[in-house]
């Protein structure tokens, strides 16, 4: 049976492309040759199955008063059960948690991730006889240039970049507390349109790094 990797995330997992000139199809979503989840599948090979679960606007545990069903915690049981059995759960969330209307800070976002991972680890969706394996990824911090993009800045709020810079510290602490794995994706390139979404190169960088980690994690 193939080793199953489920990737839960937001628009950076769905593959949103803020700069159509950076996307081969010149659209608003990177294609199957560009998205990090698809690149990860190709890098790992046929012995693995990589499933992408990306939704633009998704948060860890914080309901959005404007857009419904954005917090993955509220339906994570059904989501995980629909993809059983799972060998490794990869979660890259947090960017949308920084929105001003959600009233968060880095510590609270870290607690949100902790609550989500704790819940996920209790769901009966893991390979029989195997312990839950989770990789928490801190998304690249939002660039200060985001504040110059009127519509995006209004949606996110002026403090979003600063809040996002503090997420990795708390995600790392959460991973250590729960005995799961952690990756800081700050090394991945983001675009200079909204300063939040990965470029094609950023997707490639992320896929390459995760592909290095997966065999080590699953060998434990």
Give the ranges of each region predicted by the language model.
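Generic structural signal for helix capping and beta-alpha/helix-loop junctions
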Residues: 15, 58-60, 144, 192
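Serine-esterase "nucleophile elbow" of acetyl-processing enzymes
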Residues: 1-54, 61-65, 78-81, 89, ...
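Short active-site-adjacent helix-start/loop capping segments
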Residues: 58-62, 98-100
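Alpha-helical cap/lid subdomain in secreted, periplasmic
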Residues: 70-220
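Residue-level "edge-of-site" marker
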Residues: 54-56, 188
């Amino acid at each position: 049976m193939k080793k199953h990797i489920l990737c839960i995330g937001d628009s950076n997992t769905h593959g949103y492309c803020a700069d159509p000139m950076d996307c081969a199809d010149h659209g608003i979503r990177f294609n199957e040759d560009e998205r990090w989840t698809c690149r990860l599948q190709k890098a790992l090979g046929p012995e693995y199955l990589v499933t992408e679960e990306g939704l633009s606007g998704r948060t860890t545990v914080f309901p959005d008063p404007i857009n419904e069903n954005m917090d993955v915690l509220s339906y994570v049981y059904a989501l995980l059960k629909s993809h059983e059995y799972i060998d490794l759960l990869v979660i890259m969330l947090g960017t949308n948690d920084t929105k001003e209307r959600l009233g968060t800070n880095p510590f609270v976002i870290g607690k949100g991730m902790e609550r989500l991972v704790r819940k996920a680890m209790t769901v009966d969706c893991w390979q029989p006889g195997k312990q839950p394996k989770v990789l928490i990824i801190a998304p690249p911090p939002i660039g200060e240039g985001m504040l110059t993009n009127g519509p995006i800045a209004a949606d996110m709020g002026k403090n979003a970049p600063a809040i996002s810079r503090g997420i990795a510290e708390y995600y790392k602490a959460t991973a250590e507390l729960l005995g799961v794995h952690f990756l800081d994706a700050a090394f991945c390139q983001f675009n200079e349109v909204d300063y939040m979404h990965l470029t094609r190169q950023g997707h490639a960088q992320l896929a390459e790094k995760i592909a290095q980690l997966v065999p080590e994690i699953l060998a434990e």
